[in-house]
Amino acid sequence: MAPNNQLGKRVKLTQVRRPFIVGTTAVPFSETNPRPVGAPDNHTHSWSVFVKGLEDTDITYWLRRVQFKLHESIPNHVRMIEGEAGKPFMVTETGWGEFDITVKLYYVNESGEKPQTLYHYLRLHPFGRTEEEKQAMITKNGEVRAWSYEEQLFNEPYEAFFNILTSGQGKKSTDAAAPARRQ
């Protein structure tokens, strides 16, 4: 006989997808993006790495924390970011080089799921096969974006987590008064 589980039974033959974006943005230091006080002289860019919902929807109802493991040369290179409703999970730094960032996703306790690990490459400079592809990565303010669409697939979630996933949560973070959107 299976042990008693506080999360309920698994919802058989069910898959629930939750889309999100993992990405980096980088901006070279300039008059419009000045070097922060205390940043080393050899640093050339400010950059951010983040995990957020599509169209800035809130994902904290299913994702409770994200761990970003940065390059070992960065002080406090393992950063644990707790979820705040309506805000992306984000780390902002300065630097001069590109590197792989390990991104570990921790789900809400009701999920009963183990953490998931992803990898994302910090891009400070545009890349592509053609000049058009490179220019497509740069915004008007000179920001280089390297964003990836991801989907988290929950196979046969526990009943408690299934109810959370299908409750219609996921409001846009820019409009807290808007009605909840079904995901």
Name these PLM-found stretches.
Residues 29-142, 146:
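Compact, well-ordered interaction domains used in eukaryotic information-processing assemblies
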Residues 7-39:
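A structural supersecondary motif
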Residues 2-15, 21, 108-183:
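Long, charged low-complexity regulatory segments
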